[in-house]
């Protein structure tokens, strides 16, 4: 499956605080394999929250990413 990843300005600004380039590619690949991963956030119209365990950290060192997947046009918005 092909997806276009679109980052909000806030996500782009803060991404380097949580992901290095390799880790971010692994995260994107995970979403490419299963864009419906994560829990739907009630009342958002379909936004999802996914937990991501960063390499070298325990579960508590992981991060949460909010995203919205539009399957009809193959876009995934990283919020």
Give the role of each language-model region.
Residues 15, 36-37, 59:
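Glycine-rich, flexible loop/turn motifs
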